[in-house]
Amino acid sequence: MVAITHTPKLKHLDKLLAHCHRRRYTAKSTIIYAGDRCETLFFIIKGSVTILIEDDDGREMIIGYLNSGDFFGELGLFEKEGSEQERSAWVRAKVECEVAEISYAKFRELSQQDSEILYTLGSQMADRLRKTTRKVGDLAFLDVTGRVARTLLDLCQQPDAMTHPDGMQIKITRQEIGRIVGCSREMVGRVLKSLEEQGLVHVKGKTMVVFGTR
């Protein structure tokens, strides 16, 4: 359920960063607001971010997480210049982040000189599309227990997951899991209790050990 990128990273990162403005964001601060104008591409130098959408009642759903080496804010880059649509999602710093920002115009200029930059971005977009397609399928075909279990396995692949003698250890709140799978915090709690009774996980607060994962 969680989008995780395993796509190629830039070989000539310094060349891109030389044309970027670098900014630091504290944990939980908003980097992109839904409804903003699309005119800038972002690249994560250090840290990780959360991509999410929000309905009219303020309820949030987490689309995925991006980590060091990933681009975001790229959709407007491929729209007709001057006719870009507004940002469709929010992006928030999951932890303290260092992010490089570059205008679409400058990125287009650089990509004409070095196609590898555009290829890397395209590879990441393709990977996210695959993950999004899988998430839509999960929402349609898996019950809540299946979606929570899939999410826990995906989170074990995130950079902040820690190895544990019995598997992998992750830290996440029930509320955040609910925002990923599309259910209430209470429902997540019931599912986690069931998984623990089956001997699949151990849960203590927001720390969870997923057994048999490495």
Curated annotation (Swiss-Prot):
User: One of this protein's Pfam families, by short name?
Assistant: cNMP_binding
Q: Which GO terms describe its cellular component?
A: cytosol; protein-DNA complex
Residues in the DNA-binding region are 174-193
Which SUPFAM superfamilies does UniProt cross-reference here?
A: cAMP-binding domain-like (SSF51206), Winged helix' DNA-binding domain (SSF46785)
Q: Which InterPro entries match?
A: cNMP-bd_CS, cNMP-bd_dom, cNMP-bd_dom_sf, Env_Response_Regulators, HTH_CRP, RmlC-like_jellyroll, Tscrpt_reg_HTH_Crp-type_CS, WH-like_DNA-bd_sf
GO MF terms, alphabetically ordered = cAMP binding; DNA-binding transcription activator activity; DNA-binding transcription factor activity; DNA-binding transcription repressor activity; sequence-specific DNA binding; transcription cis-regulatory region binding
The entry's function note states: Global cAMP-dependent transcriptional regulator that controls virulence gene expression by distinct cAMP-dependent and -independent mechanisms, which allow to fine tune its virulence program in response to specific host cues or environments. Controls the expression of many regulatory targets including type II, type III and type IV secretion systems, flagellar-mediated motility, and quorum sensing systems. Transcriptional control is exerted by binding to a well-characterized consensus site (5'-ANWWTGNGAWNYAGWTCACAT) within target promoters.
Name of the protein: cAMP-activated global transcriptional regulator Vfr
UniProt source species: Pseudomonas aeruginosa (strain ATCC 15692 / DSM 22644 / CIP 104116 / JCM 14847 / LMG 12228 / 1C / PRS 101 / PAO1)
What broad taxonomic lineage does this protein's source fall under? Bacteria, Pseudomonadati, Pseudomonadota, Gammaproteobacteria, Pseudomonadales
